[in-house]
Amino acid sequence: MAILNILEFPDPRLRTIAKPVDVVDDGIRQLVDDMFETMYEAPGIGLAATQVNVHKRVVVMDLSEDRSEPRVFINPEFEPLTDQMDQYQEGCLSVPGFYENVDRPQKVRIKALDRDGKPYELIAEGLLAVCIQHECDHLNGKLFVDYLSSLKRDRIKKKLEKIHRQQA
């Protein structure tokens, strides 16, 4: 397994729309393993392949405190099941150190393939619903900062660019 490099906003590669996975093979399973290792090391609770510069529709997630609930979503799709919205303070491994409130549908149906390529479906609410929507946004080239006002988004962008310049 390997720790992968996580792209950071405003890297334009984060805007790439990921392509569907045609076949879940050993290469995809290795990507899943590497993504879990990267996510746990970061540490985070979710990671989309786009964030590690692999533009395939793959998401890993683990909302548990003890890394006991790893979830894999290959070619995930979600459908809101309610008009009710929840507001969560979201953060992102690609926007390190920043947290902002984002409104998202409270309940969603998720369809995806598992690590073995088997289709499954689940109904998600709360944090799981928020996370799958957040990670699917990554696969579509969208970040949580896109839900913010342009003023807030520009402020975050400038702060991160300054940090990147100082690290160079």
Swiss-Prot record:
Residues involved in Fe cation binding? C92, H134, H138
UniProt xrefs under Pfam families = Pep_deformylase (PF01327)
UniProt-listed Gene3D superfamilies: Peptide deformylase
Q: What is this protein called?
A: Peptide deformylase
Catalyzed reactions: N-terminal N-formyl-L-methionyl-[peptide] + H2O = N-terminal L-methionyl-[peptide] + formate
| EC number(s) from the headed UniProt entry | 3.5.1.88
HAMAP family in alphabetical order: Pep_deformylase
Single GO MF annotation: metal ion binding
Q: How is the cofactor bound?
A: Binds 1 Fe(2+) ion.
- The record places the active site at E135
Might you name a Gene Ontology BP term for this protein?
Answer: co-translational protein modification
The UniProt similarity line reads: Belongs to the polypeptide deformylase family.
Main role?
Removes the formyl group from the N-terminal Met of newly synthesized proteins. Requires at least a dipeptide for an efficient rate of reaction. N-terminal L-methionine is a prerequisite for activity but the enzyme has broad specificity at other positions.
Q: What does the UniProt keyword field contain?
A: Hydrolase, Iron, Metal-binding, Protein biosynthesis
Species of the source: Stutzerimonas stutzeri (strain A1501) (Pseudomonas stutzeri)
Which cofactors, by name?
Fe(2+)
Q: Which InterPro entries match?
A: Peptide_deformylase, Peptide_deformylase_sf
